[in-house]
A protein has these predicted regions:
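N-terminal Rossmann-like NAD(P)+-binding subdomain of aldehyde/semialdehyde dehydrogenases
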Residues: 1-95, 123, 263
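Short, flexible turn/loop "capping" segments at secondary-structure junctions
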Residues: 7-9, 206-208, 237-241, 329-336, ...
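Structural signal for hydrophobic packing residues in well-ordered secondary-structure cores
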Residues: 12-22, 30-41, 50, 54-58, ...
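Conserved C-terminal structural/oligomerization subdomain of aldehyde/semialdehyde dehydrogenase
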Residues: 15, 19, 310-463
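Flexible, glycine/charged-enriched surface loops at secondary-structure junctions
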Residues: 20-25, 45-47, 160-163, 237-241, ...
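Rossmann-like NAD(P) dinucleotide-binding subdomain of oxidoreductase/dehydrogenase enzymes
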Residues: 82-224
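ALDH superfamily catalytic-core signature
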Residues: 118, 194-326
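Short internal beta-strands
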Residues: 132-137, 248, 393-394
Length: 463
């Protein structure tokens, strides 16, 4: 087993080699490693390994996720400049040159180990960097297999395979050391992991907690909205932090919406069964704090219902009606499972109130969605919601992280801004893995008169 310092030395030697690569050579590297975690046989193997090892999600969804995430990053970087001169503006005299950030420490989640690993590697290497991945201990085998596949891709094009490594020492001391000696950290995982990254002393990108919530307005295509929400919630048994946790249909379409949800395989849990479900989903953890039961995370509705002692048949998603006060009902929380809370709102104004309260309690800064064609609703949310991304008439688990039907940058790392304790609101993607040098040349100077600057101000307030 290599030490962190030994792995870092290998990474720096590999990065030094590609530091002088051309754009064409770097793009070949990205295609080589991308293919290894996109090719059908390989990703079927990785998906099966990930489900067997972690117990999270399902194989078919993880195969699709590989295609979406890796394919999405490859689409985003195709033709993009990341070596040398990337931009020149003759009018301003500004030229921009891309430089590597160096060696990146990338911390991976157990819920989405191999697709996140593949997409991240492509984006990081696009900037002529090296990466050392720290997998979840629960997903070590599947993540290592994905990394070995990509190392084979590097060998195929004659590139140094140590551009991509997995941290060999699983100890807490090793990951702490790796974070300190890396040039940049990208942390996709729990709040504890992200806080450790931010406190390491190394520049870091992290994610905030999810609790994606969507409004269904009175003008929505209700059948289509229900279909999208169910598809999003069921996908990989809701491993994605962008999977809808709550939906807020307005009263005018509530009954129709619930009927459509039933058509899409949902079952409304009520009465004593609702209480049983709550008590099964949230239990005291090792510290005695009520927390999400690990046994329900990314499991099927049937497995969750069986554990709760609820009788259901042919059900894909469990629904519960939300109660107010919202804080007093645990179902407002992030669930990471095919369990969805439904809140009935009087109208859009009331739906907005519920949305704000939900996301202020959990998932501040992450995301929200709306199913509507009314631009005034969309613009109102854009103006007022403290969300880093607002997804309109789309599946949130697909749309938030980039998809062919929108132009969001493809990623599995969603920044939540200062609202969520992060350094950016952006989808963390390949452009976050380059340093940019700004070269400025002299141009005609700008000037202004006092009247130009303060004229209107003086008219209103005087000198």
């Amino acid at each position: 087993m290599k030490t962190v310092s030994e792995q870092m030395e290998l990474a720096r030697k590999a990065q030094a080699i590609v530091n002088d690569y051309t754009q064409e050579q770097i793009d070949e590297i990205c295609l080589a490693i991308g293919w290894e975690v996109y090719e059908d046989e390989n990703i079927a193997k990785l998906a099966k390994m990930a489900v067997e090892e972690t117990g999270y999600g399902n194989v078919q969804s993880k195969i699709i996720k590989h295609k979406r995430k890796v394919g999405g990053v490859l689409h985003d970087i195709k033709g993009a400049k990341s070596v040398g001169l990337i931009e020149r503006n003759e009018e301003t005299g500004i030229s921009k040159y891309a430089k590597p950030v160096g060696v990146v420490c990338a911390i991976l989640p157990a819920t989405n180990p191999t697709a996140t690993c593949g997409g991240k590697a492509v984006g990081i290497l696009k900037g002529r960097n090296a990466v050392i991945f720290k997998p979840s201990s629960r997903a070590l085998k599947s993540t290592t297999e994905a990394i070995n596949m990509m190392r084979a891709g590097l060998r195929k094009v004659g590139a140094p395979e140590d551009l991509i490594q997995v941290l060999e020492d699983p100890s807490r001391e090793a990951i702490t050391e790796l974070m300190k000696v890396s040039d940049l950290i990208v942390a996709t995982g729990s709040g504890q992991v992200v806080r450790a990254a931010y406190s390491s002393g190394t520049p870091a990108y992290g994610v905030g907690q999810g609790n994606a919530c969507a409004i269904v307005a009175e003008d929505a295509d209700v059948a289509e909205a229900a279909k999208m929400i169910c598809g999003s919630k069921l996908f990989d048994y809701a491993t994605s932090c962008s999977s809808e946790n709550a939906v807020i249909p307005v009263e005018a379409v509530y009954d129709q919406f619930m009927a459509e949800m039933k058509k899409n395989g949902c079952y409304l849990v009520t009465g004593e069964d609702r209480e049983k479900l709550k008590n099964h989903m949230w239990k005291p953890n090792a510290k005695g704090k009520i927390a999400l039961n690990p046994d329900i995370i990314a499991k099927s509705a049937q497995v969750i219902a069986d554990g709760a002692g609820i009788s259901i048949e042919g059900t894909d998603i469990l629904l519960v009606e939300g109660m107010e006060p919202i804080l007093g009902d645990k179902f407002h929380d992030e669930k990471i499972s095919p369990v969805l809370t439904v809140y009935k709102a009087k109208d859009f104004k009331d739906a907005y109130r519920i949305l704000v309260e939900l996301t202020n309690l959990v998932g501040r800064g992450h995301s929200c969605g709306i199913h509507t064609y009314k631009h005034e609703y969309i613009e109102f949310l854009g103006e007022h919601m403290k969300s880093s991304r607002i997804t309109v008439r789309q599946s949130m688990s697909a749309g938030n992280g980039g998809h062919p039907f929108n132009r969001m940058p493809s990623t599995a790392t969603l920044g939540c801004g200062t609202w969520g304790g992060n350094s950016t609101t952006e989808n963390v993607h390949w452009r976050h893995f380059i340093n940019v040098t700004w070269v400025n040349e002299p141009v005609a100077p700008w000037t202004f008169t006092d009247e130009d600057m303060w004229g209107d101000f003086w008219k209103k307030y005087g000198k």
